[in-house]
Amino acid sequence: VVKRSRPFNLLVAASEAIPYAKTGGLADVAGALPQEFVKLGHDVILLLPRYREVNRSGGTFTPVVTLPVQTPMGMLNAVVEEALVPVGERRMRVWTIGHDSYFDRTGLYQEAGVDYPDNLERFAFFCRAIIETMVYLQRERQWATDFLHLHDWQTALCAVYLKTTEAGRAELSATKTVLTLHNIGYQGLFPGS
């Protein structure tokens, strides 16, 4: 056991988490595990897409910042909002990344049983927005992400970006990543074109 003088800063990124958005077991784990980290004394931010379904969760979200996100489709805005959730005597921050054309939809990943044709584009944007959120946290809030805990294919590109296109950014250099795969059947496979 390694003793630390301060708790870890943990950014937990998932495409769904209870009670905000759920299609399966991923939401159960992604909603419960961050709260256990908080109970252990760590500073945790749970980061999710700002789906339409989030509005029905009962959480009260307030604006934090609008971040520019560079994508293959050009520069897009990510609207970051925050809710504070009590966890015992502590609080956990839940942040959402909003971009209406990607996330303000009937379903999380599909509609009428058919996957959205732009799921790769949607979650590549989400991953880029996660990276920009980490930079914002470091620069503007002096909150360096010690561990980025990613869940399933929808967030896995973050690990790739940190080792490739974002490897030179000082704000991200000390961040360690953990990728949890909840169901190997969902791999985020898309045509090459």
Predicted regions and their residues:
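Catalytic cores of nucleotide-sugar-dependent glycosyltransferases that transfer UDP/GDP/TDP-activated
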Residues: 1-193
